[in-house]
C-alpha cells in the first residue's frame, strides 16, 4: 500500500500546481462552438419530432421523457410500473445507507418474453379530436342545487382536462417495434433507452427506426456536451480567461483522477466534439501539447494476466482497435477504428452482451487471449475467497460482497475484472508519468506548464521555443514509468 500512497502524495503536489496555473480558454471559440451545436440541436429536434409523429400519430411525446422513449422504441407500455419493476427486480434500493441499482432477475429468453407480454400492452397510433364534453377548454360546469349552471371550473373527466381526446387506431401499432432480447433492455419505467442501449439497437434497426435511434444518440450527446462542457466551462472560467478546474484523487473507486467545476474527465474525443480547441496557450505564439499512451488498458491487462498472445501482438505492433473493427465488420457490423475501442475494452472487463456481431467478437477475443480469460477466473476466485485484490503497485481493492451466486456467477464480476485494469493503468501508471514529466520540466527550468491529465494523456501549455524540450520531457517521463 505504501508505494501507491507515496505516488499519490507526489501526484497531489503536481495537481495543486495544475489547479493553481489553470488553463486559458478562448471564449470566442467557445461562443462559436455553442452556436454551432445549438443549431445542430435544433435541427435534430425537428427531425426527431417528425419521425416520432409518423410513428405515434397524434400521441403526445417528449424527447426527454424516459417513459415516452420506452413506448416509442419498443411499442409497448407496462400495465402497472410497480408490478413491472417487482417482476423483474428493477429500479434502486438502499444498501447500507447508499442507493444502488437492484440486480435484475436472471431468466431464459422464453420466460422473459412471456412476462413482458403479460405485464405490458401494445401501444397503438392515435388521432386527436377536440373533446366534445368541454369543447376543448378542459373544464366543465356543474349544475347548482337551484338548477342553474355554475362556471366551468371542474376538470373534464372525458379528456383529463387537456381539452383533447386521443382515439386509438387498433389496426396500426405505434412506435418502432424493437424487441428486448435480454433483461438488461428493461428498466423500472418500461424499457431502457440509455446511451448504450440506443447504440446497440441502432445496429439492428432499419428504416425510420434506425434513423430515429441514430439521431437520438447524437441528440443526447450534443445535449450532454452543451450542459456539461460548454456551460460548465463558461460558468467556471475567471475574468482573466483562466479556468481553474478542481482535481480529485479520492472519488473514483478505481483510483483514477476525476475533476469538477467543470468535469473535464468525461471530455469527448476531439473528432467527435472539438471542445479541446477552446483550450489555448496563455502565451502569444504558444501551443498546447498533448501526449498519450497507446492502447494502455489492453497492454495493462496483457501484463497483469501474463497473456503470451496479447504480449506478442503488442510486441508485433498489431493495432488491436483496428483488428476489433475488422472482426466486427466481417461479422456484419461495419465499425470504424474509433468506434471499435469500446468493444476492445469491454471483454477486458468480462463484457459479453451486445449485438450478434459483438457477441461473436467477444467469443473470438476469449479464444484468442486465453491468458486474460484465465486471469479473470483467477481474480474472481481470489475476490470470493479473500474479498480483496492487490495490484503490483500495492493498491488494494476490497470486495466484501464478492460471492458465488446462482448459476455459478460471481456477484459483481464486472467490477472485480475492471478495477485492477483501470486502476493500474490510470490510477498508478499515468500519475507516475505525470510526476516524472512535471519533475523533468522543473529540472530543465521550463516556463511551460502542465495543465491537465485526462485518462491516459498529459496536456501541457507550451511556451514559445520550448516545443522540443516539452516533447522530450513527455516522452522520457512517460516511458520512464517502466524503470
In which residue ranges do the predicted regions lie?
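Conserved "right-hand" nucleotidyltransferase catalytic core of DNA-directed polymerases
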Residues: 1-270, 283-287, 363, 371, ...
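Conserved catalytic core of nucleic-acid polymerases
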Residues: 13, 20, 128-157, 164-165, ...
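Catalytic palm subdomain of template-directed nucleic-acid polymerases
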Residues: 17-41, 301, 352-356, 458-475
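Short, contiguous acidic/charged loop-to-helix segments that flank catalytic cores in large enzymes
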Residues: 146-147, 201, 229-238, 270, ...
